Amino acid sequence: MRQMIPDNSFIHQKTTIMKKYMFFCALLTALNSFAKTGDTFSDGGVTYQVIATSEGGGEVAVHSLDPSASLTDALIPSAVSDGGVLYDVTSVSPEAFKGSALRTVVLPEGVTAIERAAFQNCSLLTEVTLPSSLTSIGDFAFAGCASLTSIPLPQDVAYIGRQAFAGCASITHVAIPDGIETIGEDAFLNCSALISVSLPDNMAGVGEGMFEMCGQLEDISLPEGVQYIDSHAFSGCGALASITLPETLAGVGESAFAGCKELASVTVPQNVTGLPDGAFAYCSRLKSVTLPNSVTAIGSGVFRYDQALTHVTLPSWLETIGTGDLGGVFERCDAMTELTIPASVRKIGKMDSFPFGLNSIYVMGDVIPDGLQEMGSRNRMGEDITIYVKRSVYNEKYSSGEWNGFRVDYRIPIKMVNAKGNAVKYKTLCRDFDVDLRHSGDDLSDGTKRLSAYVVDDADGELGMVFMDEILYIPSRLMANVDGYAGEDRYVGVVVRGTPGSTYYYEIGENDYSQGAEGQWLLADAQAVSMTAHAGSNMMRGISDSAYILPAEVDSETGVAVTNYGLNNNAFRKLSGPGWMGYNRSYLPLPEKMAGTNFSMTFTDVDGTTDTIGYEAFINDCDGDDFYDLSGRRTAPTAKGVIVRKGRKVLK
């Protein structure tokens, strides 16, 4: 019988195949235990998505709420595990919690990004805790979270996306972090409860629509270094009563401050070269606007419907006015009664809609701009407006007294009455163009004294006296011909004296070039013509636009602490408190050490005649002083005629 011997090679081959199969199954099982990028899993009521894998771990993003859970308070851990693998939580996915019923959220350290619309329209969300590791907040991330009361932003946040917090109607304060680099447009649009904002020192600008329609915003300080304010940045911030624009500011966007109803005044810094369409439109309480000489273009509708605005001094280098499509620059600024157009203006755009109260336009150039023609020929107000030009321009081109429906004249009236219509002998004056008084005495009726204007040469607090020199030609725009100067111009304030109730006429000075032409006179030039003794000096401060004046302050030109005086009842009296002073007026700042209750006025005319108003106050203050007549003989302070006290001639 034949004995069978087992085939060991076959057994070995079978065993090898089985081992390979078992190894493959084990390998497949091991591979399946590691999730792939994009896989999701749930933990603690929250779904996570794998965004990166590595040996023994990976990263996940918070993806959404687990539909099977009813989570209202989310405490996100810094790491989660799935299948024995630990994943770091590093971001929140787009629309992760959009429209959910979450009330509170705590995000862990390690999260660096909140993606687009992650918490959008979570209307019940009241509190969010963000980690210090956060650097990016995406578009619409918290938009429409109407119950969210605060949002403390970590200092390393560099990016805030478009409309990231738009419609967060309960947030009251926002502090932009130091690490910010980019803020998308409309970032805080319609945060209707927002009251205050803190901006970092390194912030370069305020983006488009950043705080648009933040109707309760009343406190924001722009740091030095801000270079631009983009379009609609503060549009609709109805509670914003004041804002200081930094000297570093170089650009303002369209409608940047439109609808800031409480904004009372604004000073544009000297790096700004133009104001675009609607920049300050619908600012219904705006009273004062100061523009630097650097502004060469003003867009259309810049001040439209600013119904408290009484006057704007246009800068000396201005070239274009209202060349856009929004109508007249001053449309429905119905408190405005006059406008001065500098000689530098080369182009005026659409001017068919002007303030209803406008009655005077002063043209400094050699020709009336064509841009005014449409208003004169089509607007019913044309016949009620007088255009004033220089005497030489009138005689050469407009001697008929009419141009395209306007009256044209060179004689500008001034009536000696106060704001209440009461006849007065003294008024203060400041104009944004040169004033020539050398013909103001022509054709006066019997008993009417000529109109005289005076600068304040000196003041003596011990005597209670203000010493005034007559000036026949009052220059304006004193900085217009200073090379390289682009700041706000300076204007000459004077006191005028005439017969109470009388109407006088002055003219635009022929030397007003408005743009630094060689003929533009300085104060010393004008005083030389007037032959006054103290050329170049004037203590008066002229106001060509309405201004808010404090009773005491540090003088911006001299750096000296001063007390401010206004003319009232024939004497300079201390201002009783802060308040608005109307345009075309002036006031007297005196050093605190010179401050007295009231000051009498001593006038020196061009012919050398001197007289004093408030003489009894002058005498009472002079006990113990020596007085002399013009021959040098000592005399009594009550002597008639001209007497001399401390080198000053006084007429009694």
Located regions from the model:
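Terminal processing/anchoring signals of secreted or surface-associated proteins
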Residues: 18, 35, 76, 494, ...
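C-terminal outer-membrane/trafficking sorting elements
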Residues: 454-462, 607-652
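Boundary at the C-terminal end of the N-terminal hydrophobic targeting segment
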Residues: 33-40
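A short, polar beta-strand/turn micro-motif
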Residues: 396, 400-446, 476-612
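Sec-dependent N-terminal signal peptides
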Residues: 21-30
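Consensus positions within tandem repeat domains that build extended binding/scaffold surfaces
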Residues: 94-95, 115-118, 138-141, 161-164, ...
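Structural signature of tandem-repeat unit edges
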Residues: 69-91, 100-113, 123-136, 146-159, ...
